[in-house]
């Protein structure tokens, strides 16, 4: 009996990691757990991609018979991402954290000694106030075009105004429903990441654009932003739209929805808005995240420095 148990134990030890664990099933269980914990759909999608990519890498490894070999395979994977895929340091950090969390959830102890590398804290880019105005004014809304053309132009101008004046994420923008908006109070209820709702504001000009857009809509839908066929817009569509208007406005910088969001935060900070108020408007759970987004731009830094008159 003892010999049989020893033989069974030795047989299990000779099995590789992928034979001992059903990875596809573990991945599915992990994603269900993330959904139960109210992780956002985008976060779950990212985690799924990271874990599945690592699993596919492991399938080509043939020496996963103990923790040391599994650890070595993980390090080879990180090396592969850096050398061959040329990914950023921040992505390496994310991969390390996600894979470690997945292994911990699955009861696999191979990566306990792995430490996530430090993230880089590069300053996010932003547009200045004149560039934002040029971008929005690149959308020419005229009454001499077709009904569909006027609808599209009015919609596009409203999208640019909302992204900047409210600091929305593009995923939040395309998910907006008409009943989320209170034009009289100039507020929007955002269904944020992880089911964390928040209220954001918009200005008088954006309200006027909103009311004009609602009059010009040619399809009925609970969603605010629609294409010409009446379907909700996708994040990719909005990204390409902004890129086209930036080119038309002659802006040489890269312009994305996220850069408009950062410009919103940066300009509020420059105008004296308290950073905790900005944190609330952006929907950040940690103040440190807001501090990275709202790093003082170089021109403001120069102005403060010059006013100091050190010599």
Swiss-Prot record:
<comment type="similarity">
    <text>Belongs to the 'phage' integrase family. XerA subfamily.</text>
</comment>
<feature type="active site">
    <location>
        <position position="261"/>
    </location>
</feature>
<dbReference type="InterPro" id="IPR013762">
    <property type="entry name" value="Integrase-like_cat_sf"/>
</dbReference>
<keyword id="KW-0238">DNA-binding</keyword>
<dbReference type="GO" id="GO:0009037">
    <property type="term" value="F:tyrosine-based site-specific recombinase activity"/>
</dbReference>
<keyword id="KW-0229">DNA integration</keyword>
<dbReference type="GO" id="GO:0003677">
    <property type="term" value="F:DNA binding"/>
</dbReference>
<keyword id="KW-0963">Cytoplasm</keyword>
<protein>
    <recommendedName>
        <fullName>Tyrosine recombinase XerA</fullName>
    </recommendedName>
</protein>
<dbReference type="InterPro" id="IPR033686">
    <property type="entry name" value="XerA"/>
</dbReference>
<feature type="domain" description="Tyr recombinase">
    <location>
        <begin position="122"/>
        <end position="306"/>
    </location>
</feature>
<feature type="active site">
    <location>
        <position position="169"/>
    </location>
</feature>
<dbReference type="InterPro" id="IPR002104">
    <property type="entry name" value="Integrase_catalytic"/>
</dbReference>
<dbReference type="InterPro" id="IPR010998">
    <property type="entry name" value="Integrase_recombinase_N"/>
</dbReference>
<dbReference type="Pfam" id="PF00589">
    <property type="entry name" value="Phage_integrase"/>
</dbReference>
<dbReference type="InterPro" id="IPR044068">
    <property type="entry name" value="CB"/>
</dbReference>
<feature type="active site">
    <location>
        <position position="284"/>
    </location>
</feature>
<comment type="function">
    <text>Site-specific tyrosine recombinase, which acts by catalyzing the cutting and rejoining of the recombining DNA molecules.</text>
</comment>
<dbReference type="GO" id="GO:0005737">
    <property type="term" value="C:cytoplasm"/>
</dbReference>
<dbReference type="GO" id="GO:0006313">
    <property type="term" value="P:DNA transposition"/>
</dbReference>
<feature type="active site">
    <location>
        <position position="258"/>
    </location>
</feature>
<feature type="active site">
    <location>
        <position position="193"/>
    </location>
</feature>
<keyword id="KW-0233">DNA recombination</keyword>
<dbReference type="InterPro" id="IPR011010">
    <property type="entry name" value="DNA_brk_join_enz"/>
</dbReference>
<dbReference type="InterPro" id="IPR050090">
    <property type="entry name" value="Tyrosine_recombinase_XerCD"/>
</dbReference>
<feature type="active site" description="O-(3'-phospho-DNA)-tyrosine intermediate">
    <location>
        <position position="293"/>
    </location>
</feature>
<feature type="domain" description="Core-binding (CB)">
    <location>
        <begin position="21"/>
        <end position="107"/>
    </location>
</feature>
